[in-house]
Amino acid sequence: METFLFTSESVNEGHPDKLCDQISDAVLDACLTQDPDSKVACETCTKTNMVMVFGEITTKADVDYEQIVRKTCREIGFISDDVGLDADHCKVLVNIEQQSPDIAQGVHGHFTKRPEEIGAGYQGHMFGYATDETPELMPLTHVLATKLGAKLTEVRKNGTCAWLRPDGKTQVTIEYRNDGGAMVPERVHTVLISTQHDETVTNDQIAADLKQHVIKPVIPEKYLDENTIFHLNPSGRFVIGGPHGDAGLTGRKIIIDTYGGWGAHGGGAFSGKDPTKVDRSGAYIVRQAAKSIVAAGLARRCLVQVSYAIGVPEPLSVFVDSYGTGTIPDKVILELIKKNFDFRPGMITINLDLKRGGNGRFQKTAAYGHFGRDDPDFTWEIVKPLKQEKALPA
């Protein structure tokens, strides 16, 4: 039986790039909560003792950017210089301007256009992917790497492993079998965890605690065997972390945000962007399309691409690849997708309810993945029943 290895990684909410993603989306949430028509393009960067938010925002909302920055950092656990950043005493810089009027008139006619007329906020192409290897219809490498990171944060915050600090990375390598284009996980080959820790803990305790409290609850026993390799803090020391260890920037973890290297990626980041930015809304709708195809049993794997021109509502192209796993031809799947999904940005916004902020809705997406999440705020994860005008060919 021929197999191959594939690897996906994840990073914790305390990783400096992910800190920036969460701040950018916390700003988006604050704007949308007060003004659902806010136009937001918010970037964040951070380094030792400093966080800066900058970009273009047009909103009627009254937003205290500094308060959002400090609150987000505090909730993640950056409460002293020892852990990499002090939320209450770091410098917060703000440089926010209004959206360019040239972009505004082209995209939404300065709010005069009907939803179906709203153009894409930018050009680009986005991909959605789904696979039947997990209940989430997501790649297992990505699911496990992401869940390991989330579990690290859980046992840090609940005190199970009090030596943990906010920053950390995880990575999982799985041995797969190709079953006619579908991916079948056989076993976990390697587990890698590098986590920030305090000065007092020993490497032996780190390894023991990670195996007992993080790996064991997350990775199903059937995937582990005597040959599974564990690299647990292989560098030997990870005390300095967060923005003190590395600079952070919004939009630098786009593969972690999506499918862990599976499928494809158009290159656009998500966080800090309102739904007129098709980098985000376009990627959400094609995930729903791909997931709905796999959930309907029409393919075991599915990739959907959509592309846009700035100011133009209709997509330039829609593409489907079932990797040879389709029960019907790809061209029939494509027609089914076109009939059931409206890819115009204004209609995506309505159908997925993307103007609704609050409840930390978009901030939640900014750590531990935008897809495969069981949360009613993740409306793009809802499987859509596919209406067929005529019986599908056998």
From Swiss-Prot:
Any one GO BP annotation for this protein: one-carbon metabolic process
Database matches in Gene3D superfamilies: 3.30.300.10
Gene name per UniProt: METK3
UniProt similarity note: Belongs to the AdoMet synthase family.
Quaternary structure (record): Homotetramer.
GO annotations of cellular component type: cytoplasm
Binding site for K(+): 43
Main location: cytoplasm
Compartmental location: Cytoplasm
Binding site for Mg(2+): 9
General function of this protein: Catalyzes the formation of S-adenosylmethionine from methionine and ATP. The reaction comprises two steps that are both catalyzed by the same enzyme: formation of S-adenosylmethionine (AdoMet) and triphosphate, and subsequent hydrolysis of the triphosphate.
Record's catalysed reaction(s): L-methionine + ATP + H2O = S-adenosyl-L-methionine + phosphate + diphosphate
Cofactor note: Binds 2 divalent ions per subunit. The metal ions interact primarily with the substrate. Can utilize magnesium, manganese or cobalt (in vitro).
Top-rank taxon: Eukaryota
Entries under PROSITE patterns matching the protein: ADOMET_SYNTHASE_2 (PS00377)
Presence of keyword Nucleotide-binding: yes
Record-linked InterPro entries: ADOMET_SYNTHASE_CS (IPR022631), S-AdoMet_synt_C (IPR022630), S-AdoMet_synt_central (IPR022629), S-AdoMet_synt_N (IPR022628), S-AdoMet_synthetase (IPR002133), S-AdoMet_synthetase_sfam (IPR022636)
SUPFAM superfamilies xrefs: S-adenosylmethionine synthetase (SSF55973)
Protein name: S-adenosylmethionine synthase 3
Record-listed ATP binding positions: 15, 167-169, 235-238, 246, 252-253, 269, 273, 277
Pfam families: S-AdoMet_synt_C, S-AdoMet_synt_M, S-AdoMet_synt_N
Organism of derivation: Picea sitchensis
Gene Ontology terms for molecular function: ATP binding; metal ion binding; methionine adenosyltransferase activity
Broad enzyme group: transferase
Keyword Transmembrane in record: no
Binding site for L-methionine: 56, 99, 246, 277
NCBIfam families hit by this protein: metK (TIGR01034)
Pathway per the UniProt entry: Amino-acid biosynthesis; S-adenosyl-L-methionine biosynthesis; S-adenosyl-L-methionine from L-methionine: step 1/1
